[in-house]
Amino acid sequence: MGTTLAEKVWADHLVRKGSDGAPDLLYIDLMLMHEVTSPQAFEGLRLAGRKPRHVDQLIATEDHNTPTVDIDRPNPDETSALQLSTLEKNCKDFGVRLCPLGDADQGVVHAFAPVLGLTQPGMTIVCGDSHTSTHGAFGAMAIGIGTSEVEHVMATQTLSLKPFKTMAVNIEGDLPKGVTAKDIILAIIAKIGTGGGQGHVIEYRGEAIKKLSMDARMTICNMSIEAGARAGMIAPDEVTFEYLKGRPHAPEGEMWDKAVEYWKTLKTDDDAVFDKEVTINAEDLEPYVTWGTNPGQGVKISGVVPDPASFNDETERSAAERAIAYMGLKPGMRIKDIAVDTVFIGSCTNGRLEDLRVAASIMKGHHKADNIHRVLVVPASSRVRLQAEKEGLDKIFKDFGAEWRNAGCSMCLGMNPDKMVARERSISTSNRNFEGRQGKGSRTHLASPAVAAATAIRGTICSPADL
């Protein structure tokens, strides 16, 4: 019997096979770090008198607590300022490369690494952050870990893990016009639920996936965690190789040829068997938007807020009742009748260059609706910001009435100055719509950059086709 992509990468990094139910020991190729989950890990090393085993396989950036305006001024939030200064000290003390605020390579941790060519097929990648799964778009095994595990990886460059189950999600056929990667992953989560991938590595397959760009593939793998999975992966191909070629940390010359030769072996065998398999017809999809307070509570944009009574499962019914009340909606309300206050385009899910190009192409020649209080456009990395400005995208956003910001996590989460207030409603290209995610009492609808941009023009949730 053949093996899956995930099983191949796992086997290539196996240091020691666990016995009698014990976990396997895996070698870790790359660890990414940021200011929130690293302080205790560094302190653990310091107290034990240890040094990182392979400091050249660690890299850090500042993203979660960073302001996206006035970055040259002192951070007004004492806790955020402390976390950032602590990361800077720790990286200096232990010799870890840091891309700080204002650095040309700084960005959201899961956006700056791919742009630099650090993320490569067949790697094992970890970070103290749940959306590490983003890097699986390259055919890497990328896993979010806890702070104690961060310390363990720094000290040993290994990680103890029990093998994950495997799951195939097949997106067959061609996507209808206007349907994007964000719509695909929201549709998947709506279908299988936020626990549908629990304990599994999801491999995204099918013709629709093969035709996606790398930016789009990263969007899908990014939200594997919202489906409950430990990781998400897409087999590398010519699209992957073309994206990586010439990037700062990509192999060159003969090493490039050898790397591509290996990368081409990273695909699931025809006779491999997955533990679970789901198939979705791409032609049945349309833009998706969430109505509730978890990413699985999503519907087609042409749909309505569901009636809780329509859920057979008591837990789901109760969750729907609570979500509808929190979101200030009513069952049967058309999604396209929901007016929003704020539009956020950014995050490690949808703050890449392709996302910004899509948003700009829709906003060009328009101005934000009168009821829209603010539109924040936040590139996911400084390199993306620079390229967007070279293409003149920033001018389009500013003419539209949007705020063009510096790179950072921004309004994806309420840990920096870009917060919402109670009962403020946003349409957001980020990955989570939990209660209070974007600020205490905030109400979040997840959507694609295309839907977010169109909504900013009309003032109510809509797709570009509705304009």
From Swiss-Prot:
- Job description of the protein: Catalyzes the isomerization between 2-isopropylmalate and 3-isopropylmalate, via the formation of 2-isopropylmaleate.
Q: Where does [4Fe-4S] cluster bind?
A: 348, 409, 412
State which pathway it belongs to: Amino-acid biosynthesis; L-leucine biosynthesis; L-leucine from 3-methyl-2-oxobutanoate: step 2/4
Q: What is this protein called?
A: 3-isopropylmalate dehydratase large subunit
Family stated for the protein in its record: Belongs to the aconitase/IPM isomerase family. LeuC type 1 subfamily.
Organism, as annotated: Bifidobacterium adolescentis (strain ATCC 15703 / DSM 20083 / NCTC 11814 / E194a)
Gene3D superfamilies xref list:
Aconitase, domain 3
PROSITE patterns according to UniProt: ACONITASE_1 (PS00450), ACONITASE_2 (PS01244)
Q: State the reactions this protein catalyses.
A: (2R,3S)-3-isopropylmalate = (2S)-2-isopropylmalate
UniProt-listed InterPro entries? 3-IsopropMal_deHydase_lsu, Acnase/IPM_dHydase_lsu_aba_1/3, Acoase/IPM_deHydtase_lsu_aba, Aconitase_4Fe-4S_BS, Aconitase_4Fe-4S_dom, IPM_dehydratase_rel_enz, IPMI_cat
Q: What EC number(s) does this enzyme carry?
A: 4.2.1.33
Which Gene Ontology molecular function entries are recorded, alphabetically? Answer: 3-isopropylmalate dehydratase activity; 4 iron, 4 sulfur cluster binding; metal ion binding
Give the cofactors, semicolon-separated.
[4Fe-4S] cluster
GO-annotated biological processes: L-leucine biosynthetic process
Tell me what gene encodes this: leuC
**How is the cofactor bound, as the UniProt entry phrases it?**
Binds 1 [4Fe-4S] cluster per subunit.
Signal peptide (residue range): none
Q: How does it assemble?
A: Heterodimer of LeuC and LeuD.
Keyword annotations for this protein, in alphabetical order, are: 4Fe-4S, Amino-acid biosynthesis, Branched-chain amino acid biosynthesis, Iron, Iron-sulfur, Leucine biosynthesis, Lyase, Metal-binding
CDD domains named in the record: IPMI
